[in-house]
Amino acid sequence: AAVHYVVNEDAEHLKELLFSIESLWMHFNERFDYPVLIFHDGLSPKTRESIVAKTPGQRIWFFSVGNWVPSEAQHALHSNFGAGYMAQSRFRSGPVFHHEALDGFDYLWSLDSDSHFPAPVDVDPFLQLHSNPELVIG
């Protein structure tokens, strides 16, 4: 099992991500130690270093997914949504599950850059899924 994010180099999203990753570590992953996979469209080395430095004990792996921002024509069809949101939604709807980074993982917890944990998580959700097949659909 693993936790994953999809991010870009946007300053506001990175600020949220740093808060989220610290919250994930403090309230969940320091105890359960699942890898954190960050799919991105070109994070700079400096940005990646700052993300890893935020929680030095956490296993964070970065994977480039190329340019997944929709074309102007595609964006015009769905003008109520930002291009970045559309791209993340499209990637998470299927392609993420075929990415080689997920080989060997049975479960994936998808978090947004603005996700956070306000309190400790005392139960391992992945262990719960493994131990109770009625919780799993599919």
Q: What is each model feature region?
A:
Residues 1-22:
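N-proximal low-complexity "stem/linker" segments adjacent to membrane-targeting elements
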Residues 117-138:
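Conserved donor-nucleotide/metal-binding helix-loop-beta segment in metal-dependent transferases, i.e.
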Residues 16-19, 49-52, 120-124:
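Short coil/turn segments at secondary-structure boundaries
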Residues 21-33, 54:
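Short, acidic, metal-binding catalytic loop of nucleotide-sugar glycosyltransferases
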Residues 47, 51-106:
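Active-site-proximal specificity loops/subdomain of glycosyltransferases
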